[in-house]
């Protein structure tokens, strides 16, 4: 079992951002970079389970009605809060939401749907394709960049297009049998894995909720906002400073922004 301390995760944030080369996922990136470097000390190749949740229906938005039917990217929670942190001359929340809404409408219009599909099946197909084309692609890109930065090759067998094409056309009842997420994959692994692993509840990628990590990030943000940097030129200094000084910045730790 590998563990990463608050200081390790915070210290690697700049490196993770550099290797990601685009807006990323903070501690979700830096902790993965840390873990990949630890694995690389003993191994050059690893196998990862990325893509199984998107294909076999492991995320809550595949079975929670309020998420699967919300009419937007189901993993996004109030993006206007994040958009409001930009300076008005750089990006306005209204423009950002219009862009996201247009992207969502285009994404769902591209989902392959059969004439015989009922509303539940259509919603499930949309959740699958949104997850594969957006959520999964983001996680694969993150995995590639963090692992390669550690000189570790990570293979993703579930990303085989033949698996996606086959499972996509299976009914939801097969993939979500008896209300159990990824039930098809669990059944396929019977006899190959111990029962306590085979039937355990999904455990998401570990992200920190530590107050120590939060304190370190507050200090880093505070320092950056007081510099004459590009970061300070696109982010509203007053709003971010107010957030830093506030009691609740829990959304900084959310897996997907």
Task: Label the model's feature ranges.
Residues 8-12, 54-58, 63, 206:
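Short catalytic/ligand-binding loop motif for oxyanion handling, primarily in non-cytosolic enzymes
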Residues 16-20, 63-66:
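Short, hinge-like loop/turn segments at secondary-structure boundaries
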Residues 22-26:
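Acceptor-substrate binding/catalytic loop of class I
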Residues 55-82:
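A mobile, often basic/glycine-rich helix-loop segment
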Residues 43-59, 149:
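Short acidic/histidine-rich active-site segments
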Residues 1-14, 27-49, 136, 189:
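ATP-dependent adenylation/nucleotidyltransferase module used to activate substrates
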Residues 1-19, 98-114:
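A conserved beta-strand->alpha-helix junction
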Residues 28, 45-47, 79-257:
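Adenosyl-5′-phosphate
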